[in-house]
């Protein structure tokens, strides 16, 4: 059955006009989710089916889809819905996803942003990028193959990146005659594996056929034994609470906004908490306090702002604030740290080894860090830990970092913005890894260690003539 995009027109009619429709859209909740799993599990086809069955495809897209489906012949006489998502020529030729593709759609209940991520192991870094902003992950399992290594890998990465809602979709049920026993077996297999994952996960299971649309947006008549919700019903009903509103205030300064001599504000996106006019705030790491005089936006001043809003704060005092500083509530007693344990997803061909130094970007702040040691690498298939000397491409491990300056940090599980970082190669300026702060450590350089004059002179010479070694000032400077 071919559907054309009359969904928006119908919603406008139901709402009573364009203005009422736009107002309703602004107040809909947003769900960001990704599809992941092993190669050829049907991730792109599933997204294409969701777009098709929710009437998000225009007539010209359908015409092109018919033409491309016949030309490629990948699904016989049926539409190859994966072509709606696989945009790269290499993806279409190989029938796989390489890049992370984003798609947007909405229903009467909710707005959605989908990230279609690659299944191949060599593109795990792309999958991690897609998962970093999502609230829910759909893990596809091929009904002919079951739980595979890449399924376990993606489950681990998704939970590592803070995703707590998982939907395990057993796809291609049409190829196993819609047998309930197959679905139940894979459900038990995944639950056995999930015992090694965090205990606070919300896991749901849906049997479906993305190619034919069974249990995607409408119930399947061929699987009467399944009485649960369809995939779309799960996506519309999952409770994604914006916990960042209840968290302490975090406002990373992105730049100083000074268009003229009469205005000075500090621009950025509010990461967590609520900021209000008249609220006393503290600037970190300096510790200077002031009061919020105005909250400026493009559409005018606000009396308060919440997480995700791009704002400019004007303070009552002339305070020395620069890019990378963090504004928090004045009652906060945060301590800066110079060492931290960081979960790392490595994304470069050249492995990560102890002793190397990298540029680090975290919440608008750019600094430098040295890899003190690699505590272990996670074996994804078994989720066991093993001691290694280096972390290879797509490797995930726990690393101790020593920063060149004290930083105010949160754990990633508490705040993705102030607890997440990227590693940048200092020579090529290429992003080579992603880091998730697990906890801060008391720096060994904060101890009252006494050094001899020779040690201090040698340290100064090394830092002056061999800066690429990443040696740190023994007196605690940069």
Curated annotation (Swiss-Prot):
SUPFAM superfamilies: EF-Tu/eEF-1alpha/eIF2-gamma C-terminal domain, P-loop containing nucleoside triphosphate hydrolases, Translation proteins
Region of interest called G4, as start-end residue ranges on this chain: 171-174
One Gene Ontology MF term: ATP binding
CDD domains reported in the protein's UniProt record: CysN_ATPS, CysN_NodQ_II, CysN_NoDQ_III
Domain tr-type G: 28-244
Lineage: Bacteria, Pseudomonadati, Pseudomonadota, Gammaproteobacteria, Enterobacterales
Subunit description: Heterodimer composed of CysD, the smaller subunit, and CysN.
Region described as G1: 37-44
Pathway: Sulfur metabolism; hydrogen sulfide biosynthesis; sulfite from sulfate: step 1/3
The keyword Nucleotide-binding belongs to this UniProt entry's keyword annotation: yes
Region (G3), start-end ranges: 116-119
This protein's name: Sulfate adenylyltransferase subunit 1
Family affiliation: Belongs to the TRAFAC class translation factor GTPase superfamily. Classic translation factor GTPase family. CysN/NodQ subfamily.
UniProt KW keywords: ATP-binding, GTP-binding, Nucleotide-binding, Nucleotidyltransferase, Transferase
Chain intervals for the UniProt region annotation (G2): 95-99
Highest taxon of source: Bacteria
Catalytic activity line of the entry: sulfate + ATP + H(+) = adenosine 5'-phosphosulfate + diphosphate
């Amino acid at each position: 059955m071919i559907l054309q995009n009359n969904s928006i027109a119908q919603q406008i009619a139901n709402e009573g006009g364009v203005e009422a429709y736009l107002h309703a859209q602004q107040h809909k909740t947003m769900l960001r989710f990704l599809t992941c799993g092993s190669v050829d599990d049907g991730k792109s086809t599933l997204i294409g089916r969701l777009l098709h069955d929710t009437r998000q495809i225009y007539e010209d897209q359908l015409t092109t889809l018919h033409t491309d489906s016949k030309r490629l012949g990948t699904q016989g006489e049926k539409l190859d819905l994966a072509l709606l998502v696989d945009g790269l020529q290499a993806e279409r030729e190989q029938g796989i996803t390489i890049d992370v593709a984003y798609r947007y759609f909405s229903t009467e209940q909710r707005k959605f942003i989908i990230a279609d991520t690659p299944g191949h192991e060599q593109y795990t870094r792309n999958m991690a990028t897609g998962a970093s902003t999502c609230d829910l992950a759909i893990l596809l399992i091929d009904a002919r193959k079951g739980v595979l290594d890449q399924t376990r890998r993606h489950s681990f990465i998704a939970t590592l990146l803070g995703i707590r809602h998982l939907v395990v979709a057993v796809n291609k049920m049409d190829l196993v005659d819609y047998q309930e026993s197959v679905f139940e077996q894979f459900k038990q297999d995944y639950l056995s594996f999930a015992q090694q994952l965090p205990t606070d996960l919300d896991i749901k299971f849906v049997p479906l056929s993305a190619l034919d649309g069974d249990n995607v947006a409408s119930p399947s008549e061929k699987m009467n034994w399944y009485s649960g919700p369809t995939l779309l019903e799960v996506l519309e009903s999952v409770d994604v609470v914006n916990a960042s509103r209840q968290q302490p205030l975090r406002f990373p300064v992105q730049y100083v906004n000074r268009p003229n001599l009469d205005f000075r504000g500090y621009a950025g996106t509010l990461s967590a908490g609520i900021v209000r006019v008249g609220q006393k705030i503290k600037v970190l790491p300096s510790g200077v306090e002031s009061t919020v005089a105005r909250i400026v936006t493009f559409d005018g001043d606000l009396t308060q702002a919440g997480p995700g809003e791009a704002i400019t704060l004007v303070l009552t005092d002339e305070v020395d604030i620069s890019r990378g500083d963090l504004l928090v509530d004045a009652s906060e007693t945060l301590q800066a740290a110079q060492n931290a344990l960081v979960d790392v997803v490595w994304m470069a061909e050249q492995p990560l080894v102890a002793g190397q130094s990298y540029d680090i970007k975290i919440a608008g702040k750019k600094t430098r860090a040295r890899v003190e040691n690699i505590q272990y690498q996670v074996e994804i298939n078994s989720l066991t830990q093993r001691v290694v000397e280096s972390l290879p491409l797509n490797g995930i491990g726990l690393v101790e970092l020593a920063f060149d300056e004290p930083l105010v940090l949160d754990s990633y599980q508490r705040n993705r913005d102030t607890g997440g970082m990227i590693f940048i190669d200092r020579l090529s300026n290429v992003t080579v890894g992603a880091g998730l702060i697990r906890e801060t450590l008391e720096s060994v350089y904060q101890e009252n260690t006494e050094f001899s004059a020779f040690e201090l002179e040698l340290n100064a010479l090394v830092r002056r003539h061999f800066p690429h070694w990443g040696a740190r000032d023994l007196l605690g400077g940069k």
